[in-house]
């Protein structure tokens, strides 16, 4: 059984932790309660791969994003990793991944799945606040589809920023707080289409790009990219777009 690392005050919402912990093995079911996240994953991975390949140069040149392992050697922290849906593809791209989550069953499922997949990922049941008290830093820290579930966004981002090395990056993916996001992400996704279990999201916790950029600035991070993610019903999948009214991703750098 996963053992929790010692932690002080945290931004963790116990109700959300329990909700995601109950998903268990179904995290890895492409047709299960996390089906929408499975469909979103290729877009997230490509976005992260492309920006990190450009930023973390080798001998002064951008990395080849289409190489088998373009993220070779990069130390990445996946904060709020769930059962490892994002951590695993990043490890396959060559990254040395540390992935944390406060839900014990998530970490147990993630470890078993990584072992079956032959991947070495450092999974820890802990919080971002506890980890930020350590001396370690990372080339990139990810907060993907997690900010809308924490109680203190500014505090969470601040802890993420503390774990980014000078010259490193932070990435976040979340939901904008607009009428459009309420209609599509709450009413549509949870109550009409059933893409996510009802109660997964609280619209009041959604974060505007301006609010997120402000939180990043307070954490000594400078946002340099803001990209929307939209669902394409014709293709049945997600794609990058200029529209940030619902889902969006943001990248920020830390001064060298």
Swiss-Prot record:
Gene3D superfamilies found in the cross-reference section: Vaccinia Virus protein VP39 (3.40.50.150)
Gene it is expressed from: ubiG
Organism listed in the record: Methylocella silvestris (strain DSM 15510 / CIP 108128 / LMG 27833 / NCIMB 13906 / BL2)
Protein name (Swiss-Prot/TrEMBL): Ubiquinone biosynthesis O-methyltransferase
Keyword entries, A-Z: Methyltransferase, S-adenosyl-L-methionine, Transferase, Ubiquinone biosynthesis
Matching InterPro entries: SAM-dependent_MTases_sf (IPR029063), UbiG_MeTrfase (IPR010233)
Family (UniProt): Belongs to the methyltransferase superfamily. UbiG/COQ3 family.
Pathway membership, UniProt: Cofactor biosynthesis; ubiquinone biosynthesis
GO molecular function: 2-polyprenyl-6-hydroxyphenol methylase activity; 3-demethylubiquinol 3-O-methyltransferase activity; polyprenyldihydroxybenzoate methyltransferase activity
Enzyme class, spelled out: transferase
Catalytic activity: a 3-demethylubiquinol + S-adenosyl-L-methionine = a ubiquinol + S-adenosyl-L-homocysteine + H(+); a 3-(all-trans-polyprenyl)benzene-1,2-diol + S-adenosyl-L-methionine = a 2-methoxy-6-(all-trans-polyprenyl)phenol + S-adenosyl-L-homocysteine + H(+)
Coiled coil: none
E.C. no: 2.1.1.222, 2.1.1.64
């Amino acid at each position: 059984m996963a053992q929790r690392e010692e932690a002080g005050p945290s931004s963790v919402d116990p109700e959300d932790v329990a909700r995601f912990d109950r998903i268990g093995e179904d995290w890895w079911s492409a047709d299960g309660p996390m089906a929408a996240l499975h469909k979103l994953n290729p877009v997230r991975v490509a976005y992260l791969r492309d920006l990190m390949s450009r930023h973390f140069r080798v001998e002064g040149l951008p990395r080849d994003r289409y190489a088998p392992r373009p993220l070779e050697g990069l130390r990445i922290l996946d904060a709020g990793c769930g059962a490892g849906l994002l951590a695993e593809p990043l490890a396959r791209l060559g990254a040395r991944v540390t992935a944390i989550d406060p839900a014990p069953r998530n970490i147990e499922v993630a470890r078993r799945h990584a072992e079956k997949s032959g991947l070495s990922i450092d999974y820890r049941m802990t919080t971002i606040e506890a980890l930020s008290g350590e001396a370690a830093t990372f080339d990139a820290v990810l907060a993907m589809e997690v900010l809308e579930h924490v109680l203190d966004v500014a505090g969470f981002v601040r802890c993420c920023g503390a774990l980014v090395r000078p010259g490193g990056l932070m990435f976040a993916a979340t939901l904008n707080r607009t009428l459009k996001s309420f209609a599509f992400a709450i009413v549509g996704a949870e109550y009409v289409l059933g893409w996510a279990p009802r109660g997964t999201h609280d619209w009041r916790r959604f974060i505007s790009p301006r609010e997120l950029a402000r939180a990043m600035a307070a954490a000594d991070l400078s946002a340099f990219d803001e990209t929307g993610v939209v669902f394409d019903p014709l293709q049945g999948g997600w794609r990058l777009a200029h529209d940030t009214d619902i889902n969006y991703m943001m990248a920020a750098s830390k001064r060298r």
